Swiss-Prot record:
Mn(2+) 3 binds at residues 822, 834. Residues 403-546 are annotated as: Oligomerization domain. NCBIfam families: CPSaseII_lrg (TIGR01369), PRK05294.1 (NF003671), PRK12815.1 (NF009455). Residues 133-328, 671-863 form the ATP-grasp domain. GO terms for biological process: 'de novo' UMP biosynthetic process; glutamine metabolic process; L-arginine biosynthetic process. ATP 1 binds at residues 129, 169, 175-176, 208, 210, 215, 241-243, 285, 299. This is Carbamoyl phosphate synthase large chain. Composed of two chains; the small (or glutamine) chain promotes the hydrolysis of glutamine to ammonia, which is used by the large (or ammonia) chain to synthesize carbamoyl phosphate. Tetramer of heterodimers (alpha,beta)4. It holds the Pfam family CPSase_L_D3.
């Protein structure tokens, strides 16, 4: 069936701020869908509060609303834009839940809008546990024994019947929020109570435990002609009990027999038909009992998911794009496969390689939090690697995580390693180290229930390590021997550790033996047809499928796995660089290892290498492609750390030089530079050892801000107020940070106002692009503070000085591209805190706030253009106030008090735009899911809040200064950091934990109350 012509305007719901369980994969999916629908001639409207996304760039949709994803705001947009349909399947759980709310409040019926992609009934059947179980029963597909309960009384009654352990799954929540596995009756009571509270429909499913079973996922697509295809199977390395987002996963499934696979395939076809997803993709999860082969279906997501993004990258099949086209009426056999150009999308992908995904965690940001993994997702990012075998794929994925693969584990005794065999982020390293020491596969299977096949593969890698020592002197290895070792996935660095040489020495010997990788193409068809899309991976085989062109080319290094401090903002910058360089006539080559992102879409860059961001892997690509330039300044700290080593090996780094990067990042060099330029700095000293740090602290006096060189996201940064606190801090830093970092001790400017300044410089001229005023005072990491552009409270004289000094600094450093500088203003003096000669996490926000593509301009400068040629000669004057607010993941880390400090903890952000600064702040709060009440009771705890109380009372709220029994208020402002903050957070009460945040919140509530229901304006209307 050709596309529907009765639809003209389609509204796409985004997923809001990046959060655990719902990350960059929805920017990737949404961007694909937007492009596909616009190409078909539809008018596309987007609602998404997250500015750090490519999809919210004004060029992508016809109208882009950076507004809160609430039914009230979306209804306003529907009323204004009059869409014919809403596509809710590309914005994760947030979009599905929002679509259901719009249906239930009658908005869809009122404005005559239909849901496409997944209808109301399909969403209900897929998401409502009771309806799903009934549907499965009807088609004879087994589910875990379980019951939906709506109260604690019902739950206690059913638990008696089913026993322990028991699985608790709340309905309609994201990433398993509120759920868990209870091993004791006390755990059961606590998790069930929390699950009922977290479920928007107050219901949880209680299920029999299937801990230790094998877990599989199938990615399925269906069209209105009832053609159903399986995109790929995915197998979890970790057995049931670990959320699939936190498990290592492998595609295609490795341990299924053909008969078992066909059984799962048949069940998947029956499930998607029964649930009624007729136009799009679904992810279906199964558990298989390894003892008897019993199969049960765990759940299905009637939408594009995290696994869909992985499946797309693993196979080259663009699930989100095809899902969007199916939603407007196309059939699979009418859509061409972009990669082969001769086969239709109804051909199931076939792959001749293995893909491994490994999650990335951030427990170090939440000290004291138990790192056990369960049914609630805790990872903040992931990597993917491609190899010809599981061994090669796994070893490449492990080095992509940028963790210390061996280091700490080699020093551990056996008891310490055995203590890590429970499900936790470090389990695979502990298993590998125990196998290295001779532990048997059988005993590790008993301890972990990881499939024996996977354990045997790991054992073979460890056996190969021993054999490397028996292969004779490495200098005498011939090409064939090198190839055999490298095909197992061993890096030069690891081989060096085994034989006692440096990485560079191993590299030289390997190159002398002419042992270099070949590059293969991801083609969806196991090389049966010619591939037209340039999506590649390395291996050590004979035939090279990737011939370099003779065009001038630039390699752009991505940012690797998302993590706190280095998120989707850096991917945004690299994608913009690709576009700018393509416009300038260069062939662009992207290198990245993150499957969630737009940068790793096969049609973003001219060539994509899905490879680890390590010196060895990047340098191999540089030597293969011979580019005229390599850009390292846009992907955050990951590529910056490689800059010097790459330059030393002959890579042509363009843009800001490695020497400049070092001068700004190294604290002693930077301090000397600021003194030379006469820029005020907090009094500070650099210590090289713990003893020297204590000596300098005594000289400077407390409080001090302590931080190591070369960190991102405030890693290991802390305010210390006494010698004891400093000693504890130093012990922790030297244990946690690689090498012996120098420590900067700065006088802490209590109560100072911080500024973030983004600047562009071409070496001859510098222009400040935007100055952001932080809401929270100094001491809160800039990535966790709300900020506003343009500044509201600073006088023009201070701002002019900051602007002039920032531009002077950029020129003195010789920056060619972007630089971010942080300032603290106290008593009318602006003190410089730090400068980063690279893209910062504020780039997407500032680009939208001032309507100038900063990352594109930075790439043009790196390629030799000037600011004059680009057309940026002065600081842009914004036409509105823009506020950036953050999303914090405290709910996922149960034992952590939700207070802000110098170590960054936020995972994502929202943006609010208004002609009034306080209304912009109010919108940003709602966009970050901090739903500030306009009536009810506000509880204020702490000193210095009288003015806040007066403002809230003036707005009609009842203000109390002490909690009324156990009753919680509608808004909690607590600047003392009491445990009540945690309780309120868990009960869904909006919380504010800083005095400055309280002042802004009170003003925002007062202005919003005065304004009544806020209107909506698209980004295009704001900036035109």
């Amino acid at each position: 069936m050709p596309k529907r012509t009765d639809l003209q305007t389609i509204l796409i719901l985004g997923s809001g701020p990046i959060q655990i369980g719902q990350a960059a994969e929805f920017d990737y999916s949404g961007t694909q869908a937007l492009k596909a629908l616009k190409n078909e001639g539809y008018r596309v409207i987007l609602v998404n509060s997250n500015p750090a996304t490519i999809m919210t760039d004004p060029e992508l949709a016809d109208a882009t609303y950076l507004e809160p994803l609430t039914p009230e705001f979306v209804e306003k947009i529907i009323e204004k834009e009059k869409p014919d349909a809403i596509l809710p399947t590309l914005g994760g759980q947030t979009a599905l839940n929002l679509a259901m709310e719009l249906h239930e409040r009658g908005s869809l019926e009122k404005y005559g809008v239909e849901l496409i992609g997944a209808g109301v009934e399909a969403i209900k059947k897929g998401e409502d546990r009771e309806l799903f179980q009934a549907a499965m029963k009807k088609i004879g597909v087994e589910t875990a024994r379980g019951k939906m309960v709506h109260s604690m009384e019902e739950a206690v009654e059913y638990q008696k019947e089913i026993g322990l352990p028991i699985v608790i799954r709340p309905s309609f929540t994201l990433g398993g929020t509120g759920g868990g596995i209870a091993h004791t009756y006390e755990e059961f009571l606590a998790i069930t109570e929390g699950g009922l509270r977290d479920s928007p429909v107050t219901s949880v499913l209680l299920e029999e435990s299937i801990l230790g079973w094998k877990e599989y996922e199938l990615e399925v697509m269906r069209d209105t002609a009832d053609t159903v295809i399986i995109i790929t199977s995915i197998e979890n390395f970790d057995p049931m009990g670990v959320h699939t987002g936190d498990s290592i996963t492998v595609a295609p499934a490795q341990t299924l027999s053909d008969v078992e696979y066909q059984r799962l395939r048949d069940q998947s076809l029956a499930i998607i038909r029964e649930i009624g997803v007729a136009t799009g993709g679904s992810n279906i999860q199964f558990a298989v009992n390894p003892d008897n082969g019993r199969v049960i279906v765990i759940e299905m997501n009637p939408r594009v998911s995290r696994s869909s993004a992985l499946a797309s990258k693993a196979t080259g099949f663009p699930i989100a794009k095809i899902a969007a086209l199916l939603a407007v009426g196309y059939h699979l056999d009418e859509l061409p496969n972009d990669i082969t150009r001769v086969t239709p999308a109804s051909f199931e992908p076939s792959i001749d390689y293995v893909v491994t995904k490994i999650p990335r965690f951030a427990f170090e940001k939440f000290p004291g939090t138990p790192d056990g993994l369960g049914t609630q997702m805790r990872s903040v990012g992931e990597v993917m690697a491609i190899g010809r075998t599981f061994k090669e794929s796994l070893q490449k994925a492990l080095r992509s995580t940028e963790g210390d693969i061996r280091g700490v584990y080699a020093e551990m005794d056996e008891a310490g390693l055995r203590a890590l065999l429970y499900p936790n982020p470090r389990r695979i390293e502990a298993v590998i180290e125990l196998l290295r020491r001779g532990e048997s596969v059988e005993s590790l299977f008993d301890a972990t229930k990881i499939d024996r096949w996977f354990l045997s593969q790991l054992k073979e890698i460890m056996d190969a390590e021993k054999e490397i020592l028996d292969l004779g002197p490495i200098a005498e290895w011939k090409y064939e021997l090198w190839r055999e070792v490298k095909r197992l996935g061993f890096s030069d660095a690891r081989i060096g550790e085994i034989v006692g040489l440096s990485e560079l020495e191993v590299r030289d010997l390997r190159k002398k033996a002419k042992a270099t990788p070949v590059y293969k193409t991801v083609d969806t068809c196991a090389a049966e047809f010619e591939a037209h899309t340039p999506y590649h991976y390395s291996t050590y085989e004979w035939e090279d499928e990737v011939a370099p062109t003779d065009k001038p080319k630039v390699v752009i290094l991505g940012s690797g796995p998302n993590r706190i401090g280095q998120g989707v903002e850096f991917d945004y910058a690299t994608v913009h660089a690709v576009w700018a360089l393509q416009e300038a006539g260069y062939e662009t080559i992207m290198v990245n290892s993150n499957p969630e992102t737009v940068s790793t879409d096969y049609d973003t860059a001219d060539r994509l290498y899905f490879e680890p961001l390590t010196f060895e892997d990047v340098m191999n690509i540089v030597e293969h492609e011979k580019p005229v330039g390599v850009i390292v300044q846009l992907g955050g700290q990951t590529p910056l750390k490689l800059a010097k080593k790459l330059a030393d090996a002959g890579a042509p780094i363009i843009g800001t030089s490695p020497e400049t990067i070092h001068e700004a990042e190294d604290r002693a060099s930077f301090n000397a530079l600021c003194e030379r330029l006469g820029l005020p700095q907090p009094r500070g000293k650099v210590a090289q050892t713990p003893a020297q740090a204590r000596e300098l602290a005594a000289e400077l006096g407390f409080p001090l801000m302590a931080r190591p060189s070369y960190v991102l996201g405030g890693r290991a940064m802390r305010t210390v107020r006494s010698m004891d606190e400093l000693t504890t801090y130093l012990d922790e830093v030297y244990a946690a940070v690689e090498g012996q970092p120098s420590i900067l001790l700065d006088q802490f400017l209590e109560g100072a106002l911080e500024l973030d300044v983004d600047t562009l410089c071409d070496g001859e001229r510098a222009v400040v692009a935007g100055i952001m005023e932080h809401v929270e005072a100094a001491g809160v990491h800039s990535g966790d503070s709300a900020c506003i552009l343009p500044p509201v409270t600073l006088d023009a004289g201070v701002l002019e000085r900051v602007k002039a000094d920032t531009e002077r600094l950029a020129l003195e450093l010789g920056v060619r591209g972007l630089m971010n500088v942080q300032w603290a203003v106290k008593d009318g003096t602006a003190y410089i805190l730090e400068a980063n000669p690279r893209a910062s996490r504020t780039v997407p926000f500032v680009s939208k706030a001032v309507n100038h593509p900063l990352a594109k301009s930075a790439a043009r400068i790196a390629a030799g253009q000037t600011l004059e040629q680009i057309g940026l000669l002065e600081t842009p004057t914004p036409r509105m106030y823009s506020v950036k607010e953050v999303h914090l993941p405290f709910l996922k880390f149960k034992d952590v008090l939700p207070v802000l400090g110098p170590e960054m903890k936020s995972t994502g952000e929202s943006m609010g735009i208004d002609s009034d600064p306080y209304l912009a702040f109010y919108r940003a709060q709602l966009g970050a899911k901090n739903y500030l009440p306009l009536e009810g009771t506000a509880l204020l705890i702490g000193d210095g809040l009288d003015e806040v109380a007066g403002t809230l009372e003036g707005a009609g709220l009842k203000v109390i200064r002490e909690q009324d029994g156990d009753e919680l208020p509608d808004l909690l402002i607590d600047v003392t950091g009491s445990p009540l903050l945690r309780t309120a957070l868990e009960r869904g009460v909006p919380i504010v934990s800083t005095k400055e945040g309280a002042e802004w919140t009170a003003r925002a509530v007062a202005e919003a109350k005065k304004a009544g229901m806020l209107g909506v304006r698209s980004l295009q209307e704001w900036v035109k």
